[in-house]
């Protein structure tokens, strides 16, 4: 995935050292965009092996509206462990905002169902938007949303998605985010009778943690390999009916995994 490697090069060549909330330190740039044509393969990084199981289960967890890590733990996914409280709760994070945004007048808005309805019935709308950034509930969240706002675009029978990510951990988080939102776009496209178009990834503070620099350089020394193919069960026409067994990845031939510590 040359787009990702170009991002890494851009940060190493143009980034500025900055302090951060975690105390780790970063090399950071502000404002960057990548585009992925989903008809040209599934954008799962090949310069290091990624744990696709975690990506799929986390996405299904978001879609369900769940904000407790029990489902993730039951399926061998530990990526949210550091932020959960003693009962496994994370507060009103992504899934809650997608499926039950609380309004000031006491109502609850299912943004995800709403945007799917609009894609089907008003595809030319410029309001095909879901936001995770609920200012009134940020302080209740274990971690404010990093990937916080996405918009869909329908043209010529295809569905594209653009994500705005305010904070982008380029070594660990961004490869997961690319694959997750690419798959999400494919799932919604199938649910709406459309083909998947592009995933457009817009980054705000795009950074490499200082303790990841050598790992990023190792990735840059590796040649990217052909992208794999994601096969989705064609019988599922409802986004909320997908399960883990409905996804099969083929032709994935990545370079070996590279370890890196998560900044908490």
UniProtKB/Swiss-Prot annotation:
Q: Where is the protein localized?
A: Cytoplasm
Q: What SUPFAM superfamilies does this protein's entry cite?
A: Thymidylate synthase/dCMP hydroxymethylase
Specify the superkingdom: Bacteria
For this protein, the record's CDD domains field holds: TS_Pyrimidine_HMase
Q: Could you tell me the EC number(s) of this protein? A: 2.1.1.45
- What EC class does the entry list? transferase
Catalytic site positions: 146 (nucleophile)
Give the PANTHER family listed for this entry: THYMIDYLATE SYNTHASE, THYMIDYLATE SYNTHASE 1
Protein name per its UniProtKB record = Thymidylate synthase
The species is Ruminiclostridium cellulolyticum (strain ATCC 35319 / DSM 5812 / JCM 6584 / H10)
């Amino acid at each position: 995935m040359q787009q990702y490697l170009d991002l890494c090069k851009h940060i190493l060549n143009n980034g500025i050292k900055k302090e951060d909330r975690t105390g780790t330190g970063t090399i950071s740039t502000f404002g960057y965009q990548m585009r992925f044509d989903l008809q040209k393969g599934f954008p799962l990084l090949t310069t290091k092996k990624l744990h696709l199981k975690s990506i799929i289960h986390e996405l299904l967890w978001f879609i369900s509206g769940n904000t407790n890590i029990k489902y993730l733990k039951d399926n061998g996914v530990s990526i949210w462990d550091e932020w959960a409280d003693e009962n496994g709760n994370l507060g009103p994070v992504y899934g809650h905002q997608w499926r039950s945004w609380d309004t000031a007048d006491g109502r609850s808005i299912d943004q995800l169902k709403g945007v799917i309805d609009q894609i089907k019935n008003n595809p030319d709308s410029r309001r095909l938007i879901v936001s995770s950034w609920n200012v009134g509930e940020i302080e209740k969240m274990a971690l404010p949303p990093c990937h916080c706002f996405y918009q869909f675009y329908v043209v010529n029978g295809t569905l594209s998605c653009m994500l705005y990510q305010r904070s982008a951990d380029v070594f660990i988080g961004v490869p997961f985010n690319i694959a997750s939102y690419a798959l999400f776009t494919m799932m919604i496209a199938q649910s709406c009778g459309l083909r998947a178009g592009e995933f457009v990834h817009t980054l705000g503070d795009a950074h490499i943690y200082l303790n990841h620099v050598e790992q990023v350089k190792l990735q840059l020394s590796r040649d990217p390999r052909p992208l794999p193919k994601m096969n989705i069960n064609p019988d599922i026409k409802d986004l909320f009916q997908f399960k883990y067994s409905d996804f099969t990845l083929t032709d994935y031939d990545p370079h070996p995994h590279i370890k890196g510590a998560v900044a908490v």
